[in-house]
Amino acid sequence: MIDVNEFDQIRIGLATADAIRMWSNGEVKKPETINYRTLKPEKDGLFCEKIFGPTKDWECYCGKYKRVRFKGIICERCGVEVTRSKVRRERMGHIELAAPAVHIWYLRGTRSWLAYLLTGNEPREDLKAKQLEKVIYFAANLVVGVDEDRRHEDLPELEKELVDERTAIEEERDRELDRRQEDLETELSEMEAEGGTEADLRARRKAAEKDLTFAREQYEQELDVLDRAWEEFKSLFSRQIIEDEMLWRELEDRWGDYFDGGMGADALAQLIDQIDFDKEEITLRSMIDPPEGERPLSVQRRQKSIKRLKIVAAFNRRDEHGRRVNEPRAMILDVVPVIPPDLRPMVQLDGGRFATSDLNDLYRRVINRNNRLKRLLDLGAPRIIVN
């Protein structure tokens, strides 16, 4: 083990998914802690001996290897290394997440570091913490990028296609409503010929008119969504938040090739990956202190740009090997570290009950939900259920 007295200094930074996997001795796949009958750790669970080391000095899980002479041997039967039990104070595990999750520290707080980082340089590209929260919790969609050149080039052709489709829908609506009206008149004539009462005729006409109104409204709604989607698509820009799910589906189905986006932490991860931090830092510096002849920013926007520059510059810091000191992508978790079991112990009380650390309950909840999500994804469940 490392001696605490050997350190001159310590630096705290963001841990990347690869770093967490490197620290880890294995993936924790099951939420179980110990078997309450044998009182031994469950395999692949939160106290697994294969991952964290043996509970008894110089003894593997199955008991095949005992004593110090087998030091360093990994049992071929149970996979546990024969070593001291104190390694359970230092060996870590990890949980592979089925879907990425945003670290709450960087979303909420006195400042939302994610909101400052992901905000664009134009006023319309401003992103607030509450908006990001909606994206993260699957209540809104985020436009990550737009192929503006291709859209501009194809816009006349797309508009012509839209006009043709709109005309076709209107013609279909008129035909359908005329057909229903004719069917109603024929039915009423037959009822009258068969001696139907005035009350019956009136009731049938009222029901039919209700159906006609509903059908007309359905067509109007379809045309309205089409018009709204087209207007939205023409002015679509990166970092735009769209809360209307029906409108987003229409945009994605029709013109999904022209833009990228989505909801959840995945969308934020895509946006972070698109940021060129070197270019962004230069742009922000020129915005804060513009060259002579250029219009300066307002006081409020200048203050915001200064705060954003601090974050971008901090993420742009490099070590002696040219690697980033802190990776911004690490604010979004793909892997959760599991601390050593002896730092979150289970203690047996009188009467056979156990006292356990709150961390074990937290890990158990994360693993249960993660496994449930993995099963849904493996089954190919619809997106609306997964989200």
Which residues are covered by each model-predicted region?
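Extended, highly charged clamp/arch subdomains and adjacent linkers
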Residues: 1-387
